[in-house]
């Protein structure tokens, strides 16, 4: 993220996310997105609670938030950033998650953690977007990946 890049949206709350993405419980995996900047970067926020449906099976004796959920949340954060960034100039209505590259899981995420999905654009070609994401808990990277998506109308 470029600190000098102007902020376009300081806060996209859950109500705005529900208007932007088609995802709903249990697959809506971000609570808000903050600091969407003109350079197509921003931060998704997820407050992880023990009530997450995934914890029923991952793992009952030692709950660990699934890495696949973090990757999906990165894609959702990138989708919000992409749609909000072109709002008013284009009319995308759907985001399709297409690729995952360079994915690494570094530390477990536990109930009570707050995950910050730091996403920044790697580039765009017409309706295709590529983002790099770092998932962080307390400032430490717990997962990272490059994700690709397509915005369509």
UniProtKB/Swiss-Prot annotation:
Keywords: Cytoplasm, Lipid A biosynthesis, Lipid biosynthesis, Lipid metabolism, Lyase. GO terms for biological process: fatty acid biosynthetic process; lipid A biosynthetic process. SUPFAM superfamilies: Thioesterase/thiol ester dehydrase-isomerase. Its main location: cytoplasm. It catalyses: a (3R)-hydroxyacyl-[ACP] = a (2E)-enoyl-[ACP] + H2O. Pfam families: FabA. One of its GO terms (cellular component) is membrane. Involved in unsaturated fatty acids biosynthesis. Catalyzes the dehydration of short chain beta-hydroxyacyl-ACPs and long chain saturated and unsaturated beta-hydroxyacyl-ACPs. The active site is at residue 58. The keyword Cell membrane does not apply. It comes from Bradyrhizobium diazoefficiens (strain JCM 10833 / BCRC 13528 / IAM 13628 / NBRC 14792 / USDA 110). GO terms for molecular function: (3R)-hydroxyacyl-[acyl-carrier-protein] dehydratase activity. NCBIfam families: fabZ (TIGR01750), PRK00006.1 (NF000582). It comes from the Bacteria. The keyword Lipid biosynthesis applies. This is 3-hydroxyacyl-[acyl-carrier-protein] dehydratase FabZ.
